């Protein structure tokens, strides 16, 4: 574990003005790394994120015989035979949910015994629904605790057929099945059940990446897809900036009435979390109810921004935040209440931020427990722009997805104390 250091963001007294280039998208980078590893040939991935989450994915591929070179700080060059070898050791994936779920399904397409494992936090994050789905497809896979570690006995390819999975659950399970399906022994149909489809935008990211790497995917109605067993073709692939990272900068601009140029328009993103830009633009008149189901990684940003809104905000459709890197609903509620008692309330799986714009300019004594969750650390830094005395525990956990976050704030004139 990282040492429990703290960091304090010092309030700013002027608008934040400058240019910051957000890092590449974590979601797209790990999809592209997986697909490049499954493809035969050499793929060049530009604009990529280099962080803890993408490092564990690239290292896992290397352990299985895939060559992954890094000629610069935003490029991966992936050369693969299209066949992975079972390593002698477990694939350790830290607390990277994308890498863990995506690899668990993909490994069913290869021969050998594999173990997918993670750190103490990943070992508390559910993977049972994906394991159950793979078992129904004939894969020999087990995760006795319902969380990693996961043992997979690969038999050379997913069997052709149809698999149903609850669309209310994590979109990462669905993406994992879709991406693995193209390397199976025959066509695979993935159908969603349930009353709602959570995080549909992330499925669109998956389908776009699959098609870019040569997969043939056909939509069957609104909630099912047929994936042909074509495999993947190596390709050059550019990765857009991370929309979740952009939300912190959009919010910093809104809070300080600044002008931060990200080098990309908010409507140019394909990632679903970019939807938050419209809500941030409405600050300090954010809506009374915000449905977070399609932009879950943006909710921490919006929740802290809502603390300074002119009216209370209820966040709905965010139940999956309880099984992210930590229980983000509770972490947000506890952190906001550390700043001001009663500033947030949990009602079931909803989060209500009561809002108090008069907090700006005050001084508090608040220690924010991030639970080593990068998004909790980054979002509460925003509160520090307006309120003195907010200390953030384990600030270096931002390395999971945005290693340069504190430097980015410094480049805009924000001072921090460690």
UniProtKB/Swiss-Prot annotation:
Record flagged with keyword Lyase: no
Catalytic residues as annotated in Swiss-Prot or TrEMBL: 297 (proton acceptor)
Positions with a binding annotation for phosphoenolpyruvate: 26, 97, 125, 172, 328, 375, 400
Entry-linked InterPro entries: Enolpyruvate_Tfrase_dom, Enolpyruvate_Tfrase_sf, EPSP_synthase, EPSP_synthase_CS, RNA3'P_cycl/enolpyr_Trfase_a/b
CDD domains, per database record: EPSP_synthase (cd01556)
Top-level taxonomic group: Bacteria
GO biological process, one term: amino acid biosynthetic process
GO molecular function list: 3-phosphoshikimate 1-carboxyvinyltransferase activity
UniProt keyword terms in alphabetical order: Amino-acid biosynthesis, Aromatic amino acid biosynthesis, Cytoplasm, Transferase
Gene3D superfamilies cross-referenced by the UniProt entry: Enolpyruvate transferase domain
Residue numbers binding 3-phosphoshikimate: 26-27, 31, 170-172, 297, 320, 324
Record EC number: 2.5.1.19
Compartment(s) of residence: Cytoplasm
Family per record: Belongs to the EPSP synthase family.
HAMAP family tied to this protein: EPSP_synth (MF_00210)
Subunit-structure text: Monomer.
Designated name of the protein: 3-phosphoshikimate 1-carboxyvinyltransferase
Source organism per UniProt: Pseudomonas syringae pv. syringae (strain B728a)
Organism taxonomic ancestry: Bacteria, Pseudomonadati, Pseudomonadota, Gammaproteobacteria, Pseudomonadales
């Amino acid at each position: 574990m990282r040492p429990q250091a703290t960091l304090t963001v010092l309030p700013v007294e002027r608008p934040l003005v400058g240019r910051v280039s957000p890092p590449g998208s974590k979601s797209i980078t790990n999809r592209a790394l997986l697909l490049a590893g499954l493809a035969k040939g050499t793929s060049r991935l530009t604009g990529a994120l280099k962080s803890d989450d993408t490092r564990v994915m690239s290292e896992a591929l290397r352990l299985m015989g895939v060559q992954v070179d890094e000629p610069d700080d935003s490029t991966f060059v992936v050369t693969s035979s299209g066949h992975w070898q079972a390593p002698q050791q477990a694939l350790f994936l830290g607390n990277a949910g994308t890498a863990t779920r995506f690899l668990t399904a993909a490994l069913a397409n290869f021969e050998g015994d594999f173990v997918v494992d993670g750190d103490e936090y990943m070992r508390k994050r559910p993977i049972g629904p994906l394991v159950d789905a793979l078992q129904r497809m004939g894969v020999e896979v087990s995760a006795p605790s319902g969380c990693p570690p996961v043992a997979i006995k690969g038999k050379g390819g997913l069997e052709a057929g149809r698999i149903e999975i609850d669309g209310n659950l994590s979109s990462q399970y669905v993406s994992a099945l879709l991406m693995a399906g193209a390397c199976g022994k025959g066509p695979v149909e993935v159908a969603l059940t349930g009353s709602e489809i959570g995080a549909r935008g992330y499925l669109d990211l998956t389908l776009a990446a699959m098609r870019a790497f040569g997969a043939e995917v056909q939509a069957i109605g609104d909630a099912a897809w047929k994936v042909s067993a074509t495999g993947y073709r190596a390709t050059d692939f550019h990765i857009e900036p991370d929309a979740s990272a952009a939300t912190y900068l959009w919010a910093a601009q809104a809070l300080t009435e600044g002008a931060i140029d990200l080098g990309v328009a908010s409507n140019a993103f394909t990632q679903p979390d970019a939807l938050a830009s419209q809500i941030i633009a409405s600050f300090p008149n954010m809506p009374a109810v915000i449905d977070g189901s399609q932009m879950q990684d943006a909710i921490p940003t919006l929740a802290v921004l809502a603390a300074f809104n002119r009216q209370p905000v209820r966040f709905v459709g965010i139940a999956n935040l309880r099984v992210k890197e930590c229980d983000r609903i509770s972490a947000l509620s506890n952190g906001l209440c550390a700043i001001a008692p009663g500033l947030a309330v949990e009602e079931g799986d909803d989060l209500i931020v009561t809002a108090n714009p008069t907090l700006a300019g005050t001084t508090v004594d608040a220690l924010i427990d991030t639970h080593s969750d990068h998004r909790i650390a980054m979002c509460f830094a925003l509160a520090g722009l307006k309120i003195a005395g907010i200390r953030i525990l384990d600030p270096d956990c931002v390395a999971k997805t945005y290693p340069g976050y504190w430097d980015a704030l410094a480049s805009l004139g924000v001072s921090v104390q460690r």
